[in-house]
């Protein structure tokens, strides 16, 4: 696609495109060499491994680092599918298509997110069962969460947690409500996409999987 754009062979709504990263949807008329083409042919999805200590946003009034400080200029117009907070890590999906973003974020589409979570203290069976039934805290109702202990000691516990929604700071809020602190939070999967061995601060292009 970038090669076609550099050769000025693509038009959107009659205007020649001279840079990548333009958001398009079904409402746009896209042409390649004066022939109409389906808009999804230009859809792009990237996987990015977000490090701790950066924001999922294009800019920050406090001048804190954002994920776009790690990405090349050609991806500066990409939009994120979901978010991770400043101190969370792991998989972020990026796309140039707002319809794809909405598809993955809408709760009714039920895309699973999987996290590895480190908490201070011990997580017992009672907590695991409570998560499985759904959790209510700070006047917010959270859907059932499947959690399992990966490893533990007297001081900490590593969990894998499977969620079907993406409420703001969901995992952190749940553990705060039972006086436990999350010290690491890493998303390893979102729907059909997995973090795999992608290194921190690195990205790769992926095929669209509905």
Description of each model-found segment:
Residues 2-210:
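Basic, flexible Lys/Arg- and Gly-enriched helix-loop patches that mediate nucleic-acid binding at interfaces
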């Amino acid at each position: 696609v970038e090669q076609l754009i550099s050769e000025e062979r693509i038009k959107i709504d009659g205007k020649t495109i001279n840079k990548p990263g333009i958001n398009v949807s079904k409402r746009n008329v896209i042409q390649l060499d004066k022939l109409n083409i389906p808009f999804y042919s230009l859809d792009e999805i990237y996987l990015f491994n977000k490090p701790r200590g950066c924001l999922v946003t294009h800019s920050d009034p406090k001048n804190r680092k954002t994920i776009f400080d790690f990405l090349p200029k050609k991806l500066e117009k990409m939009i994120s599918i979901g978010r991770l907070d400043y101190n969370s890590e792991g998989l972020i999906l990026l796309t140039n298509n707002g319809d794809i973003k909405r598809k993955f974020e809408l709760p009714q589409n039920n895309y699973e997110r999987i996290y590895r979570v480190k908490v201070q203290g011990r997580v017992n069976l009672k907590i695991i069962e409570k998560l499985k039934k759904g959790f209510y805290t700070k006047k917010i109702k959270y859907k059932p969460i499947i959690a399992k202990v990966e490893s533990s000691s007297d001081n900490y516990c590593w969990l894998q947690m499977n969620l079907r929604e993406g409420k703001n700071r969901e995992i952190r809020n749940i553990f705060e409500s039972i006086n436990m602190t999350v010290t690491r939070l890493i998303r390893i999967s979102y729907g059909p996409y997995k973090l795999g061995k992608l290194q921190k601060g690195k990205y790769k292009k992926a095929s669209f999987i509905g």
